[in-house]
């Protein structure tokens, strides 16, 4: 076993990486409220895992979406648990993110030189809200349908560009298959990818600059 480790150590300097990770200074004022960002990340990872599991059975069509969700809940082994965990962790992610924002604001973690860390956090907040909007529509039940119709209709109040924006969001003049396809693509591919990129940037900046000091 030691020979295998030595082989990797010679090429990748694993011990130096491990020492850098484990030897980072943690200020004495840090408490449990500084873990809220990490809990938000954990919820996101749970979302990715449970969401990926459901893609094996979910059908993103207006005729089959609701039936496929019912199938997941009633026929798939532990499907009810997977979907329930997905929903619970989604709610928890939003709650932890809000509490994390309050903690950062109240402790001045957004001030110089951490402005960019705050900006990436704001972007992550918008992405999290977008997850909620797009995911809410995927069962394509009455609640999901009318929620999508209302949300996508909001830009219509904007002069000149309002109507084109609505059509861009819906994929057509009215809510239908194109809308569901767009929201499914956003929810399962675009938003997770963007969230992963901005989370990486967020954590790298925290890693570089360290945790902000007490007020």
UniProtKB/Swiss-Prot annotation:
Binding site for heme b 1: 34, 100, 103, 202, 212
Keywords for this protein: Chloroplast, Electron transport, Heme, Iron, Membrane, Metal-binding, Photosynthesis, Plastid, Thylakoid, Transmembrane, Transmembrane helix, Transport
Stretches that traverse the bilayer: 32-52, 90-110, 116-136, 186-206
Binding residues annotated for heme c, in chain numbering: 35, 207
Family annotation (Gene3D superfamilies): Cytochrome Bc1 Complex, Chain C
Cofactor names: heme b; heme c
SUPFAM superfamilies reported for this sequence: Transmembrane di-heme cytochromes (SSF81342)
Pfam families assigned: Cytochrome_B
GO CC annotations, alphabetized: chloroplast thylakoid membrane; membrane
Subcellular localization, as worded in the UniProt entry: Plastid, Chloroplast thylakoid membrane
GO molecular function: electron transporter, transferring electrons within cytochrome b6/f complex of photosystem II activity; metal ion binding; oxidoreductase activity
Record note on cofactor: Binds 2 heme b groups non-covalently with two histidine residues as axial ligands.
Any one biological process term the GO annotation gives: respiratory electron transport chain
Membrane topology qualifier: Multi-pass membrane protein
Binding site for heme b 2: 83, 86, 187
InterPro entries xref list: Cyt_b/b6_N, Cyt_B6_PetB, Cytb/b6-like_sf, Cytochrome_b_N_euk/bac, Di-haem_cyt_TM
Oligomer status and interactors: The 4 large subunits of the cytochrome b6-f complex are cytochrome b6, subunit IV (17 kDa polypeptide, PetD), cytochrome f and the Rieske protein, while the 4 small subunits are PetG, PetL, PetM and PetN. The complex functions as a dimer.
Note from the entry: Heme 1 (or BH or b566) is high-potential and absorbs at about 566 nm, and heme 2 (or BL or b562) is low-potential and absorbs at about 562 nm.
Similarity section: Belongs to the cytochrome b family. PetB subfamily.
Protein's name in the database: Cytochrome b6
Species, as recorded: Spinacia oleracea (Spinach)
